[in-house]
Amino acid sequence: MNIIDELEWRGAVNQQTDEEGLRKLVEEKKISLYCGVDPTGDSMHIGHLIPFMMMKRFQLAGHHPVILIGGATGTIGDPSGRQSERQLQTLEVVQHNVDALTAQMKKLFDFGGNSEVKMVNNYDWTHEINIIEFLRDYGKNFSINSMLAKDIVASRLDTGISFTEFTYQILQAMDFHHLYKKEDVQLQIGGSDQWGNITSGLDLIRKLEGHEAKVFGLTIPLLLKSDGTKFGKSAGGAVWLDPEKTTPFEFYQFWVNTDDRDVVKYLKYFTFLTKERIDELAVKVETEPHKREAQKVLAEEMTKFVHGEEALLQAVKITAALFSGDIKSLTADEIEQGFKEMPTFQSSKETKNIVEWLVDLGIEPSRRQAREDINNGAISMNGEKVTDVGTDVTVENSFDGRFIIIRKGKKNYSLVKLG
């Protein structure tokens, strides 16, 4: 199947400006296409990842992706999907975010050697345009009537929209025109909320370059979970690509915990597995859901893609240790990842009796209860049961002098930080 057929099979096509024309174009030649992201933060989350997964598919099919980081548009703010104005960021913050997103993109796409992938920053060409040029060369080609009719603007008319955000669609259209002229880009990909911005770009190119210009737009559907909520959030909030914000272990766990009703859809959307392999996993979901094989494959594929093989192996190791309770083989860094969301306590490094120590920290409510739990085998320290109420807790008990893990009962873990 060609790339458009594959995207449709994967459920990744929402709207196309000219399905027949685009299908014919990609069958005739390898095209250049682009997708952009504004540096509104210093990390993408997995919701941002969706259109770039489609760009990666085009790359693997031999096409030439252009990744746009919005160093200019990021200073303005995209009104799409918002009910209120964005808070303007300083140029210093925007540049910091540009650098961070650029580094993330370099991990996802191969920019080395003879790679056909390019990364551009729209600040490089936008900052040279003065206000007179903007109004004469570009503004003249936009009708206020058509701009007001765009969903991204119409939805804000009651609550209000600034002239700054109102002109965002012109800036994005300018990007498409610039890339069409300089990089021969013929297709823009974006989320479903970008339809108005994309069609503005098509209109501008045709007005400036002639109606025979072969340019196209394609949007990705809004991805919803089976319960109707928006994809991309965990109980702790957004799932980030930055390992400092969402650890590889947490990232892995997010995918492992995917609902049976969603997992096949996610395998199609997010992995590069073949149709045959995904069909096999779909059968396993129906016949052996308790094994959660599809979820494990999804988690492995995504963690490896975003964080690499080493981080995946670490996440799998932490998961296995937590499941079995055998945590002795974990390193201090793995402990920090795996127990990040557990109840956390602070302790000095001085030697102390286990009973006194548990009560002082607040893990046990009283000395009597602490002694009773120890005598009943309900207390484990770093994966080993504590059986003697006379046991002393020392730095030697810790992981690298930093952490001690207490388990009370079967599943109640506590992380104790020494310092």
Swiss-Prot record:
User: What's a Gene Ontology MF term here?
Assistant: ATP binding
Instruction: State the UniProt keywords alphabetically.
Output: Aminoacyl-tRNA synthetase, ATP-binding, Cytoplasm, Ligase, Nucleotide-binding, Protein biosynthesis, RNA-binding
Query: Top-level EC class, please?
Result: ligase
Question: Would you say which domain of life the source belongs to?
Answer: Bacteria
Q: What is one term from the GO cellular component aspect held by the record?
A: cytosol
Q: Where does this protein have coiled-coil stretches?
A: none
**Catalytic activity, EC:** 6.1.1.1
Q: What does this protein do?
A: Catalyzes the attachment of tyrosine to tRNA(Tyr) in a two-step reaction: tyrosine is first activated by ATP to form Tyr-AMP and then transferred to the acceptor end of tRNA(Tyr).
Quaternary assembly: Homodimer.
Tell me the protein family, please.
Answer: Belongs to the class-I aminoacyl-tRNA synthetase family. TyrS type 1 subfamily.
Give the protein's recorded name.
Tyrosine--tRNA ligase 2
Species assigned in the record: Bacillus cereus (strain ZK / E33L)
